[in-house]
Structures are given as structure tokens and as C-alpha cells.
């Protein structure tokens, strides 16, 4: 089922025998672009940050959160919405059957390895096979997601950095090797509508800016571990000496140490290069749930947090 000017429209049975490219063309161009609908999946804070961006730009969305999502049990033994998702409670469904508007785009903002993303993506695309999949590729590639799905779904990757989206004006996109240019163009349109300028890059783990930034943060963490300087001095040196907008350790806290660790683990697994080996401080801090600003503590201590 697709939408035509906001109304459900059933395709004739024979349409499902058309090539994927033609079906995608029909799905996209029978839609009024102003009514493009997005289904956000997963209960992480990254989902909440993208929801804020979509809401602020008046783009309709629904959040699908399964009852067995780990984030539902992060604050007790009974399932409950994490605090950061409470403002969007009216947009959250816990059953695919409750998604009233078939989405044009399924958006997964979580910086997880592909094998951790795929079960939820599978569950959703079985119900909405015409949707384009827009997937965070901080810890995987779009082609890897397409490989796991084992179908001709169009998968586009993007470099969504939590804690960075509010001020960011550019976002990186990557196309799975088998995905269509049509799908990429559609995603560019939607990202432009949310205030982003898009840069299309090769489909690699971490893309460009997130990958380089994570590597720099890792080096800063090693400098702390080796007592080369205090964390304050390291951050001050990068802000005043290199003119970075934030110190690297402060920046890591803002993005989330768990996110940085996820990127570094994925880069090290992909390339086996020493420069991507995560500093043990990242792993130890994440084990202690010191994930940065979101948790109230990371390299620095903060007044509030919800992790």
C-alpha cells in the first residue's frame, strides 16, 4: 500500500511483478512530497534527536518501538518509555499494525553493528516493502545492511551524529552498491527539507567526518591515559591551537562515548589498523555507563543525564 495525496492507495496485483526500480519510482512519484512520511525505528536517544529535527521542520513521523527493546528496560524491570522519548509518546507505536500511514522512508538512527540492526529492520520491511531504508552507517555500511536483508531493498546510509545534529548543517549520505540513484535522490530531498545540505560519499564504515572525528577523539583519550596532559589542557589545546569548535574530549562526551566506541570498534573490525583500536578508557567508561552528557558523566561530570 502506498499513499496518494495522503490517502491509502492499493496497487493492482500485477504491479508487484514489476522490477524493484519501477515499483520504487511508482511509490515515490505517486506521493505528494510535502506529505512524505517517515518511520523511525528503535528506542535510543539518537531516535529522539532525529525526531526533534523532523518535528521542528514539520515532517510527519512515527516511532516504532518494540516491547523487547533494551531501552524500554533501561530504568527498571518493567517496560517504560525512556525519558528522552516521553515528549514523543503520542507518536510512538509498539506494534507495526498500529502504523496508520505507510512510510516512504524507514529511518534507523542507531549507531549499531549491522547484525544488531537487521532484526528490527526485517520486521518493518516485511510490512512496508516499498519503503526506502535510511540507516546510520557510523558502525556499518549500507551495503552490509543490504547484504543481511538479502533482498533488492534500497538502502541509503547517513552519518547521523547524536549531540551534533542541532548545529549541523551538512550530513553525509552513502548509497549501498546495489541501491538506485532514485532512492538516493529521494533521501536528498528529504534531508534538504530538514535543513541539511547533503554530501554524497563512498559507502564506508563511519563515512568521512564521523570517522576522522572518532579517530581524533581516540588519540585524545590515549593522551589522557598516558598522562601526557590533563583533559582540560588537551581540550584547550585543540580549541585554541587548532580552532576546533569543541575540545575533543568534551565533544566525545556530547556525541556519547558509547557512540564513539561503537564507531571505533566497527572501524577496527573492518580495517584491522592500529589507529582504530579503541582506547581502554572508552570501554571502561561505557561499562560504567559513563557515556558522557547523556549519562551525567564521561570525561567530565554534568549536572543532569538520563542513562
Model-derived features with residue positions:
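Conserved binding/recognition cores within well-folded domains
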Residues: 2-3, 220
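NAD(P)+-binding Rossmann beta1-loop-alpha1 motif at the extreme N-terminus of oxidoreductases
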Residues: 3-6, 13-14, 18-19, 24-94, ...
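Rossmann-fold dinucleotide-binding core
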Residues: 32, 48, 110, 118-122, ...
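Short phosphate-binding/catalytic loops that engage adenosine nucleotides
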Residues: 59, 196, 229
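Rossmann-like NAD(P)-binding element
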Residues: 79-132
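Active-site-proximal catalytic alpha-helix in oxidoreductases
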Residues: 164-175, 185-186, 192-194, 202-226, ...
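Helix N-cap / loop-to-helix initiation motif
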Residues: 180, 229-233
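Interdomain hinge/lid region at the active-site interface
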Residues: 236-239, 243-307
